Design a protein with these regions (language model features):
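Cytosolic regulatory regions built on CNB/CRP/Popeye-like sensor folds
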Residues: 1-122
Length: 122
């Protein structure tokens, strides 16, 4: 079974990952978005109201909410270290879900686990 980041990398339209330097903003809380990400290499801080609530690492995915109906980003994402990200837009996401249904389950699991962790912090 493919890990979700490998799936993202396979189905992204552009062959090259997005590269972010340590401290660089990937997206802001409240910003609209049209891509989800998978960490190929590096670490990303997840912030809510300017506070780091989680650090995610190589092999994890994030940002899928905007592809499944959430209108704007519910958190900010900032590269903690130099980071390479695979990414999918909505069309690529839907194709990946259709071609590899396990990917959809992995995305739902990641999304629900992150939501549960964030709710426990409130």
């Amino acid at each position: 079974m493919l890990n979700p980041v490998v799936t993202v990398s396979i189905f992204q339209k552009q062959p090259d990952p997005k590269v972010f330097s340590a401290g660089q903003v990937i997206f802001e809380e409240g910003q609209s978005g049209d891509e989800m990400y998978g960490i190929i290499q590096g670490e990303v801080n997840i912030l809510v109201n300017g506070k780091i609530v989680e650090t995610i690492e190589t092999g994890e995915i994030f940002g899928a909410g905007v592809l499944v109906g959430v209108k704007s980003r519910t958190y900010a994402a900032i590269a903690k270290v130099d980071t390479k990200l695979g990414f999918l837009d909505e069309q690529g996401f839907l194709f990946a879900v259709q071609e590899t249904p396990v990917f959809a389950l992995q995305v739902m699991k990641s999304y629900s686990e992150r939501l549960s962790r964030l709710q426990r912090m409130v």
